Swiss-Prot record:
This is GRB2-related adapter protein-like. It holds the Pfam family SH2. Residues 1-58 form the SH3 domain. The keyword Hydrolase does not apply. SMART domains: SH2 (SM00252), SH3 (SM00326). It comes from Homo sapiens (Human). Residues 90-103 have a biased composition (Polar residues). PROSITE patterns: SH2, SH3.
């Protein structure tokens, strides 16, 4: 999972990771400490304060959108296998995956596949 640094941080301990505002850090572990995450920046690993970063959402997660909007988004991505995960409209608390499963035909994409996860 990626995050972006909201502020610069200067490490004061050998196991901490220094970074600058705007850096993109790879989060390796979010579970060991409630205030610190283990992260990587340019091949170096260390702990970072979680309140200094903003976790980037996964590009494939679209949250609460309709099936129709999911299809529109997939048409814009315009490639076979493009997918997204969204909250299920028909089964609250579950998720659906929408996949472009056909190659482009003329001006629009072929059928989409929608499956409920759960």
């Amino acid at each position: 999972m990626e995050s972006v640094a909201l502020y610069s941080f200067q490490a004061t301990e050998s196991d901490e990771l220094a970074f600058n505002k705007g850096d993109t850090l790879k989060i390796l572990n979010m579970e060991d400490d409630q205030n610190w995450y283990k992260a990587e920046l340019r091949g170096v690993e260390g702990f970072i304060p979680k309140n200094y970063i903003r976790v980037k959402p996964h590009p494939w997660y679209s949250g609460r959108i309709s099936r129709q909007l999911a299809e529109e988004i997939l048409m814009k991505r315009n490639h076979l296998g493009a997918f997204l995960i969204r909250e299920s409209e028909s089964s609250p608390g579950e998720f659906s995956v929408s996949v472009n499963n056909r190659a482009q035909r003329g001006p629009c994409l072929g059928p989409k596949s929608h499956s409920r996860l759960g």
